[in-house]
Structures are given as C-alpha cells and as structure tokens.
C-alpha cells in the first residue's frame, strides 16, 4: 500500500509542476486542483502507452513512473517550483465552499466501496449496480496483463469498446501490490479534488466573484428540481425517500424524475464520469483563459491535459470538442489573424491525432458497429420510441432541473458577451444530445447534458447574486437567497441523506472466500461459466472472464451476446462436452444465483464427470480442464 501511495504522490507532484508551468500566475487554490487533473491525466497516459509494448505488467508500470520522474526532473531543471505561488484573497472561500461536500464524499466512499461489515462487503444504493463492473474491469486488466484488453464479460474475443482508462488508473495499484479497495479508491481522491476545485475556479474566473462561484458550486453539485413535491403528500410517502430503492426526489422514474444528483448518482458510482470531469473541468478552465482571455500560450497545456480524455470518458471528450468549436467561432469573430489561428490549429492537430489513435480501435469502432449505438432520438429519456413525449418538453426540464432551468433565459440576457459565447458551447452540447444518442441507453446522454447544465448554473448563480445585491435590506436579501437555495437544492439534500443511510450487502463471506481462492489458484486467462448475475464474484472480485455477463452491462455496451447467453443456458440446463469445448470453458460455478435463474440446472452431470475444484457453504466449482 505504501508503494502505491508513493506512486500516486509522484504523479500528482509532477502534475502540480505541470500546472505551475502552465499557469504561473495561479495561487495554491488553482494549482492544487489543476495539478490533480494533470496528475490523473498522466496516470492514465503513461502506463497505458508503455503497456502497448510491455503488456499491463510491473515493468510497464515502473517505467511509467520513471517517465513521470524524468518529466518532473525536466520541469525542475527549467526552474519550475511550487513555492512562491501568487496570493489569493479568495483562497479561503474555495476551501470553505467545497469542504462540506468533500467530507460527504469521503464518508460515502468509505461506506460504499468494499466496506467490510461482519465479514461481508457492503455498499450503498448508488453503487450496487455499477461498482461490480468497475471492480471486475480493474481486476481483470491487472491480473491478465494483456493490453489492449479484451472484453471480459463475454466468452471469445471481443473488442473492449468501453473507455477503459478510467479503470487502468486503479489497475496500476493492483500491479504494485495494493488490495482492491485501496486500488479502487486511491486515484478517486485527487480526481474529486480536481472536479470540485476546478469547477469553483472556472466559475470564479468566468464571473470574477467568489460568491458567485460558491453559489454556482452548490447549484450544480447539490442542485435539483421540484421532485421533492411528490413526497410531501404524507409522512409515509416522505419516509419512502429513505427506505425505498431509488425513490428519491432526484430519481423517481414513476413520475419521470431522472435528473440525478451529480455526487451520489454520477461521480461516486460512475468512474468514467468522475475521471472524465477530472480532466474536463480543468480543461474548460484552460479553454476559457486560452480562448476568451487571449492566453494563446496555453494551447499545448490544454492539449497535454486532454490527451487521454476519449478513453477516460468519451462523452466528456465530445463535450470539449463542441466547446472548442464554439470557442473557435468566437476567435474568428474577433478577426482571423495568424497569431490567433495557429494555436487553434496546433490544438486540433495534437488532440485530433492522439484521440483518433485511441478511438479507432476502441470506442469509435464500437459506436459504428456495436448494437443500438449511434442513432437519432429526441428529448433524452422524456422522448419515447414512437416519437411522442412522456411530458411536455419544457415541463419535463422544469420539474427535473428546477430553478436553474427557469432562470436560463434571463441569466443569458444578463450575462456578458464572452459568457454568452461560453454558454453557446453548452447550447451546442444540448442540441446534439437532444437529437443524437451515442449508446443503447438513452439515459446516458445525461453525461453530455450535465456539461450544458454546469454552464447554466454559472449564469444562474451570477444572475441571483447580482439581483439580490440590489436589495438594500440585508434581512430581505438573505431571506430571498435562502428561499432560492431551498427551492433549488432541497431535493438533492434529501437524496444525499438517503444515500448516507443506505446500506446493502454486496458480497457475502462465502463470495469473498471464493474470489480469494480463484485469485490465488485460477489461470489468469481462465473462462468461467457462471450465471449472468451482475454481482458474480468470479468477475467482480477475482477479475476472471465469464461466458456471459449481466445484460445490464453487455447490452448497454453495445454487445451482441445472444450466442453467449444461449450457451450459458444450455450448459446449465442441457450440458454437453462439445459446447464446453467450443467455448473453451475452464470452470463451472454452481451457487444460489445459478439456481435462482436456472431452476433445472443439471449439476449432477458435472459432478459425474469433473472434480470439485472449490467448495464452500455457498457454492461449488467444477474444474473442466
């Protein structure tokens, strides 16, 4: 564990040096979160590049550290130092603003990620679905050593079309000897600091106000719509928020409420979003200074920061492209000159080449030939397949987003010209996301919509602060702001409260014992026959390939898994040796999830032919070869 901490510290230190070099006028409150963004970006890039030649192995991981050390040495040799940073009178305002959210985040990470309770792993509501997939990907990449990795949730050879660099940033620590919980959590800590700190710094830079930055921060991270109204009818209905499964004011499908809280429903459970925003938010900060403040020297630093973005979070990469396109139009509108256009061409050339190299064999190929991927669809999850809408277009967003949505038009009118151009990039994102879906799950277009919403929160916060500044009586000013904050945030407060109290068993002691035995004794490339339960410990905890993973994963990754599913069912209900050989199955698991799905599972056929390889009170595993 100590080696992993030192490894992460090296990358963060080099990231801080890069941030200091990129923004020499930055204060500690800017350099620290910006440096975390650079550090995580390096952590994604360097091990992956070296793994292309060496596999995802210890030599590749150590050489990546050496490369980071060389980069840090070059920066130090060129006189870059962390001391002597600019003073910032608003530094305290940043930390006072983000500290409550940071504490909540740390507590939820502690209770939601492999939290040991009486010998079993527990989690919370938001992580019950997604986290097993992320754990399995992280473990598989580390223990298999192959790179580019194959898709481990289906038998045979399948393209890994998921943005897997959000997993490799944890896999490196498994290779270094850390346990799975430590490896999972370590890179998330600087990532959260980057997301929170750079959102605040971006807003402060755009609005030139710490007060507006703080209000925008809470409008975004703790903002919500009017979904709480549906729970005010009775004490019993209100109590459902804290006892039901996904019956919260920000996630209540029954009433078409699905504008979720960014912290508990996006950043904590969805690693791609976290690591995407960890790079995107500082990138937008640099983009603002590069494009709208005329700091043309920043383009190489923006390009360097954004290098791994497509395979960290493809939606964030697309959002950044659209923001840059609008920024480029703004630059042209100011007058096309050689000194203003060349930096844009450099940024486009570097990112275009690097991004295409990453995307062509992975996410782009998957988008083009995957199942139910790129297609037309109107109005996010409010739109239905027959072209009709569940709710009126505007009412849907009013009740989901709430006050911020109602203020968008007056806030845009109130904004300064450069701010309108920046928000114009958000409108481009909205327009694309409302008409084109990039994955089988329409819901996942919210990864684009939240970037538009982020920019809307900045304008709304500016309008509210300026509006109430005109109220001379301090009590009325405070009362008005408090009322707006209540209307804009009460739903998220309840949602976060529900998440804090949620507690579910993820894996039993028997599941953990099975995973430990597999980890120690099974071949790294072994294929297991299991049920398609999303929590099967064979994949989630031991990182081994399985014949057919949960449809809630493989379908939404655009995979055609009909053959694997049929083979799984046949091998449990009507097993035969030729099908086992055809799929190269090495082990067969029988546990409660198998019998829950296949009541006629024929374990006796395996017992008569193959030895029991492992057994505990919850399962038996037969070794086929």
Residue ranges and their predicted role:
Residues 1-91, 103:
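Membrane-embedded, hydrophobic transmembrane alpha-helices
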Residues 102, 297-308, 323, 345-350, ...:
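Transmembrane alpha-helix segments characteristic
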Residues 102-279, 314-318, 504-505, 532:
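Active-site lumenal/periplasmic loops and adjacent helix-entry segments of GT-C-fold
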Residues 104-109, 222, 226, 312-316, ...:
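Transmembrane alpha-helical segments
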Residues 189-192, 273, 318-321, 442-469:
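Hydrophobic/aromatic-rich transmembrane helices and adjacent perimembrane loops
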Residues 264-267, 286, 298-314:
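Membrane-interface alpha helices of multi-pass inner-membrane proteins
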Residues 282-290, 323-334, 399-420, 466:
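Hydrophobic, aromatic-rich transmembrane alpha-helices
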Residues 472-625:
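Extracytoplasmic
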